[in-house]
Each structure stands twice: as C-alpha cells, then as structure tokens.
UniProtKB/Swiss-Prot annotation:
Amino acids binding substrate: D121, G184
General function of this protein: Exchanges the guanine residue with 7-cyano-7-deazaguanine (preQ0) at position 15 in the dihydrouridine loop (D-loop) of archaeal tRNAs.
Keywords: Glycosyltransferase, Metal-binding, Transferase, tRNA processing, Zinc
Recorded GO MF terms: pentosyltransferase activity; RNA binding; zinc ion binding
Family note: Belongs to the archaeosine tRNA-ribosyltransferase family.
Annotated source species: Picrophilus torridus (strain ATCC 700027 / DSM 9790 / JCM 10055 / NBRC 100828 / KAW 2/3)
SUPFAM superfamilies documented for this protein: Pre-PUA domain, PUA domain-like, tRNA-guanine transglycosylase
Pfam families: PUA, TGT, TGT_C2
Cross-referenced CDD domains: PUA_archaeosine_TGT
SS bond list: none
Protein name per Swiss-Prot or TrEMBL: tRNA-guanine(15) transglycosylase
Needed co-factor(s): Zn(2+)
Cofactor note: Binds 1 zinc ion per subunit.
C-alpha cells in the first residue's frame, strides 16, 4: 500500500494488481458469474474500480469452469479491471464441507487469472467457543502456509470469532499474506452487532502489517462504512446492492427503506425523474430489480466518496460522530469505539476545527493526548492555579490579568476548556483555539477531572483575582517552552535566551531566534516547525531513538539536500513518532541529515515500503525546494 492521505487509522491509499491500481477506500461489487446484468461501463460510471466473484461457483459449474480456464476470468466476468475471487468458505460454512481442498481451489483461482486469490479459510461463528475458534485460527494459518504464493496477491482471512486476543493472533499470523480480509463477520452485520464489529476490526487492524490492504468481508451496507474505515478498513465487498434490490429495498447512507414506504426518490438517485416509487412497484420484476440495484450502487459510492473527502479534510471523526446518532446500533458502536485509544496514530493537528458536541467529544484521540500531558505538566508538585472562564476563554482573555499571573508567579497554570483543565500555554495550539463548541459542558465530569488532577498534585486552587508584584518570568518564553514540552515530549526547557518575533497584525508568535539564527517558527496550528539549528538542539536533548528516523547513507545524502525520506530507505525509527510532528532524519551514527514532518506514526513506519515517510523541510546542506 502506498499511503496518500490519512486520519488516525483511516487512509486513502493505493496498491497495484495485475489488472491495474486500486485506490482505497472502495467497494467491490459482488458479481454472480451466472447472472451479471451490469456491464463494465455501467459499473465504472458509478465508481467501481474492482469486483469480486466466487471461484467455488465457477469451479463446480462445468460451463463456467471450462470458459474461465479457456478464456480467463476477466473474459468470463466481462470486466477488464482487478477481480478478486472468494474461495467458497461461506458456502462451506452454510452448506457444509465443499468438495475441493484449499490447495485445489487456490490453484484454480491462479489458473483462471484472478488478481486477488483467497485461501479456503475456516469460518468462525460469533457464538463459537474460545477453544474451537482458536483451533480454526490455527488451521486457517496452516492452510495459508501450504500455499505457494509465487508472485500472486494471496488473501489470508483473519478469523477468531468475537475474541480480541484471537483476532490479534490471527491478524499477526495472516500478515504473511499480502491481503487481509476480516472474515466471520456476516452474522454480526446482519444482526446489527456493530459494537462487536468495532472490537473485531480494531484488534485485527492494530495487530496486522499496516502495508496490507484490510478488507471487511460482507460489509457492504453503507451505514457502517465510515466506522469501519475509521478503524482501518480499506475495502468492502457488497452483494447488498443486488440482494436488497431483489427484495424491493433501497440502501441509504443511514439505513434501508422499503420501496413501498417511500414517497419519492432522492435527486441523486439514478431512478429520480424516471419513475415514482409506485410506478416502479408495478414495473416488470427484472427491470425493477435492475433500477433498484443501480440506486443501491449509487448510494454505496456516494458514501465512499464522502468518506474519502472526509479523510482528505481530516473530518472523518466528526462524520462518524454525526452518523452515530442516526441509528441506536451505530451509537452503541461509537461508544465502543471511543474506548479504544488511537492517539498513537492521531496526527499532531488537523486541517479542520475540532467539534465539541458534549462530553463524548473528549474521547477524541487528540484530546486524550492533551489530557495525558496535563497530568504530566502538573506532576512537578508546584502550586497550580486554575483560571476560570471569567478571565480566559478560547480566543478571548483579560490580557492584563493573565499576563500578571503568568509573569509574576512560577505556578502551573490551567484553564477550563470544555469540561476539562488544560495548560494555559497551549491556548493557541490545536485544538484549544481551533474549536467549534456547543458549550454543553458536563459539571460532574469537570468535578471528577479536578479530583483526578488533585490525586496527582493536591496543591491546586482557583484564581480569585489576586494581584502579584514581582516579575519572575516571560509570558512568551514560557509559552514556547510548554509547547515544546508537549510537542517533543521533553521535560526540560527548549528555549532560553530567545528573541521572539511576533506578527505586527495579530500579535501571534512567528519566529524564535537565537544568535541571529531562526531556531523555530510557529505554525498556524500553534505548534513549532524546527529549522536545522532547532533540529540540532532537539537531537542533543532527546535520547536515542527519540523522534528519529534512521536512513542509509545513500538516502542521507539526498535528505541533507532537502529531499524527502522514502520508506524503503528507513533502517530504524522511534515508534513514538506522531504523524505530522517534527522528525529528525539521522544516520546510524546519529549524525543529523535533515528535519521534516512524519507522514505516519512510528508504529506504522516499519511496514510501508513505498511512498514518502518524512516530508523534509530543511536538510543540513539545503532547505527543501
């Protein structure tokens, strides 16, 4: 996978197959080889890049078998792009053992020219016993290992029922395959057990090779797409577009509606303006099914396109939070999802403002990171003062009062922010000021959070309007040092005798200069971009391997001249790197080559083999162009 854009575990990425590239996230419509009434041009016009069909059905039908072997799968299906084949696992699960072995069905898929070939895995039911599920996980892995991959894309399904540790084990083992479907989930999807799916997807994703495409088998209803993508799913397959059409049902992004229950078709529907619902109900069955299938396909790809746009905008989390209120099962899934800490994968900041709805918004991974820092910030046992909204709110403050408190005390200073307390000096940093808030704070949560902070430092009180006389420190210097502490995870002062240059129009900090050299500039999101001088300073302060990406000498020579770092040249790295944060590019001897922004988290660095890992903004020899 080559990553293009990302938000936490969600990504827009692409990978190559023998019949072309696939950009994810996307959906593969299921094509019945016996009955394919949508031609390739129609499928392409709706956004279809790849399709999936069942090799078991083809193999056991003499006519289809002979045709596929003689002319190839793409001729049989009449689709020139990538085609994935399933192995018959679900048929085996529903109807009992099938007549072909794992190796036979895989060899058949190879022979007919499938682009993505699926092994015959062993299906695990949601109500399966732990021991039974574990034995099926091991058996599925054994089946993967008996296959000769050659140069093919082999899909190794992740099984394990609803047991998190088995899903983790299976994902780790099956990462030997180049493509990772998450299997055994159709019964959960059909019964709206989305909270169980959240558990399955998260545990499968974080234990897998991040360079592998992750596919949710059978996850073809658009109402759950955004949740699955947020948790790291790249692809879906959908028979629902035709299955629901045959049953006179229509797919929408928030659920399903019966044809006889709707008054009119939405304007985006390909049926709009051609039929009324009542007219279509009386249409001949085959034509009605085709029209409803086109509506359903359109609904699926509208949702996929919306999700991709949300990833690009960095608003997918907001979208999931919005969609959670569209169905009780989705809300339960969202409440399950926020229990998982994905802050390791979360970028330093987002393109779009932070949306605060209510206390559930505080489970956003970026807020969890700030809350963790707040606890560390006050752990020095200093007197801690909380400044109320009377004196400080995002973007609005009593300048004289705040400056007096800051410069004439050495206290830890916190402000009230959406029901929690955070360091005052992060006031301009994302998302403290880059915020759209409902103002619906939870007083009980605020009280509980204060108790938690007092368990760390009991010397906490609220500011009551006192005036302080003796100047002890500089406001701006304290601010940039606190930002550096948070951004670089350091416990000592990064700046000391600095000359701080501010914007004449806004008064915001722009450059930090020492000895006539720019050490850092303040980004629009309130965080620091380091110059090469600043990078040398960070290198001296952070013990190995902190915030480092180690590259070979060949890459290092290019990086020193301002060129980006590519994944394939990385030799080692700090797993604590945050996407979008400053990253030091060094040699194996810890000599600095460059500084830039990490494209992915440190946890992901190991897995990707193509694309840009660090976008360099300055090398030791030259700035980036």
């Amino acid at each position: 996978m080559e990553i293009l854009f990302r938000e936490n575990l969600a990504r827009i990425a692409r990978f190559k197959t023998p019949h072309g590239e696939i950009e994810t996230p996307t959906v593969m419509p299921v094509i019945n080889p016996n009955l394919n009434f949508l031609d390739e041009s129609t499928l392409r016009s709706y956004g279809v890049q790849a399709v999936i069909t069942n090799s078991y059905i083809i193999k056991r039908n003499q006519r289809l078998n002979e045709d596929a072997l003689r002319h190839g799968l793409h001729s049989l299906i009449k689709f020139s792009g990538p085609i994935m084949t399933d192995s018959g696992t679900f048929q085996s699960h529903v109807y009992g053992d099938i007549e072909y072995s794992n190796k036979e069905i895989v060899d058949f898929q190879k022979a007919i020219g499938s682009d993505i070939i699926t092994i015959l895995d062993v299906f695990t039911e949601p109500d399966e016993s732990y021991n039974s599920a574990r034995s099926k996980v091991i058996e599925t892995y054994k089946r993967l290992k008996e296959i000769d991959f050659e140069d093919k894309i082999i899909a190794g399904p992740v099984q394990g029922s609803i047991y998190p540790d088995l899903r983790r084990l299976s994902a780790y083992l099956m990462s030997d395959a180049l493509y990772l479907p998450i299997g055994g989930v159709v019964p959960l999807l059909e019964s709206y057990r989305y909270s169980d799916l959240v558990k399955i997807i998260f545990n499968s994703k974080v234990s897998s090779d991040f360079s592998r495409p992750v596919h949710l088998f059978g996850g073809g209803h658009p109402m759950f797409f955004a949740f699955a993508v947020m948790l790291g799913v790249d692809l879906f397959d959908s028979a629902s577009y035709i299955k629901y059409a045959k049953d006179n049902r229509l797919l929408y992004s928030e659920g399903t509606r019966a044809l006889n229950d709707i008054r009119e078709f939405p304007e985006w529907s390909p049926i709009h303006g051609k039929y009324t619902p009542q007219e279509l109900l009386h249409e001949e069955s085959e034509k009605r099914t085709r029209m409803l299938a086109l509506h359903n396909l359109k609904s699926i790809f509208i949702e996929i396109n919306e999700i991709k746009e949300r990833i690009y905008e960095n608003t997918l989390y907001n979208y999931v939070e919005e969609k959670a209120r569209s169905h009780p099962a989705l809300f339960k899934a969202f409440m399950s999802m926020i229990n998982y800490d994905t802050s390791d994968y979360s970028p330093l900041s987002y393109k779009s403002p932070f949306f605060y709805y209510d206390k559930t918004s505080l489970n956003h991974p970026i807020i969890k990171r700030i809350m963790k820092f707040t606890e560390n910030y006050i752990s020095n046992s200093r007197h801690t003062l909380i400044i109320s909204s009377k004196y400080w709110r995002p973007g609005v403050k009593n300048e004289n009062v705040i400056k007096n408190i800051v410069e004439c005390t050495d206290f830890n200073l916190l402000v009230s922010w959406n029901g929690i307390y955070i360091p005052l000096f992060l006031e301009d940093s994302y998302p403290v000021q880059q915020l759209v808030s409902s103002g619906l704070n939870d007083k009980k949560l605020e009280e509980d959070y204060l108790k938690r902070l007092k368990s760390i430092n009991n010397d906490i009180e609220f500011y009551e309007g006192e005036h302080y006389d003796k100047r002890l420190r500089d406001y701006d210097t304290e601010k940039i040092n606190t930002i550096a502490m948070f951004q670089f995870n350091i416990n000592e002062r990064f700046f000391d005798k600095s000359n701080i240059i501010k914007s004449k129009s806004t008064g915001h900090i722009r450059n930090i200069i020492e000895d006539n050299n720019i050490i850092a500039t303040m980004r629009n999101d309130g965080y620091l971009t380091l110059s090469i001088k600043g990078a040398y300073r960070l290198l001296s302060m952070k013990p190995w391997p902190g915030l480092r990406v180690v590259v070979d000498d060949e890459s290092g020579r290019f990086n020193a001249n301002g060129y980006n770092v590519f994944f394939k040249f990385i030799k080692s790295f700090d797993t604590g790197i945050i996407p979008g944060n400053e990253t030091l590019v060094v040699s194996e001897d810890d000599d600095l080559y460059a500084v830039g922004k990490a494209a992915v988290s440190g946890i992901e660095m190991y897995y990707y083999k193509s694309g840009v890992a660090v976008k360099v903004h300055e090398g030791v020899n030259k700035k980036a162009a």
